[in-house]
Each structure stands twice: as C-alpha cells, then as structure tokens.
C-alpha cells in the first residue's frame, strides 16, 4: 500500500487512504485524486489515478522487490468486450503488449471501479 502514496493526494482523509489497503471480496479499482507530482503518462488528462491493490503473488513480489507500485494498463478497453484470452489481448494491443499475466483467480474478471472520494461506482 505504501507504494501508491507517491502517486495519490495524501492530503485526503486518512480513512479514505486506509480504505485502499482493505481487502475486498472482488477485484476493486479505486479512482483516487492524484498527487501534484504524478506524471500524465500515468494519469492522462485526468486529475485521478486508478489504484488497484492486489494479493496476486507475482505482482506482490514485483512491488516488494522493487519497492514500487507496478504501473500497468487494463486489458479492458473502454467500450469494447473484455479480452478473455491472449489472442484477444494481442488483437487489442498489437505490438504494444509486452507481457500479460496468465488468467487466474486474481485477474480473470474485470474489477469494479469506485471513486474513492464520492463512493460512486463506475463499473
């Protein structure tokens, strides 16, 4: 959880920040106000950054050993059917796909998306 702090607005209420570290029964992505130093390469033109805390062992391993958040893109392109296999992923991303985790219990379904501040569910 500490690895996301450089990317989010840490002046948020501590209860909201702590909510990011709470385990959920379904994959959950939170939209969180970004820090002033978060690159637009991560947030795009948005004032929010998408944060997903996971217990997926490989991702946890990378974060712990690099002492950093893992920055990734979603396999669920807005307005398109969810990619459910490698062939669909490759069709969506062409040559820009460098690696994808094989489907497992941590990543086989799209996450729900919730605005951390308002509580509004987007998906």
Model-derived features with residue positions:
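Active-site-adjacent structural elements in enzyme catalytic cores
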Residues: 1-123
């Amino acid at each position: 959880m500490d690895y996301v702090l450089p990317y989010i607005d840490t002046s948020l209420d501590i209860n909201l920040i702590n909510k990011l570290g709470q385990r959920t029964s379904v994959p959950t992505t939170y939209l969180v106000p970004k820090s002033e130093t978060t690159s637009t390469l991560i947030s795009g033109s948005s004032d929010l950054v998408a944060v997903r805390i996971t217990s997926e062992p490989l991702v946890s391993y990378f974060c712990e050993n690099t002492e950093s958040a893992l920055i990734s893109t979603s396999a669920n392109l807005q307005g398109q059917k969810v990619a459910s296999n490698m062939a669909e992923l490759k069709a969506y991303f062409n040559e820009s796909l460098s690696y994808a985790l094989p489907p497992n219990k941590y990543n086989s379904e799209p996450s729900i998306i919730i605005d951390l501040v308002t509580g509004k569910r987007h998906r």
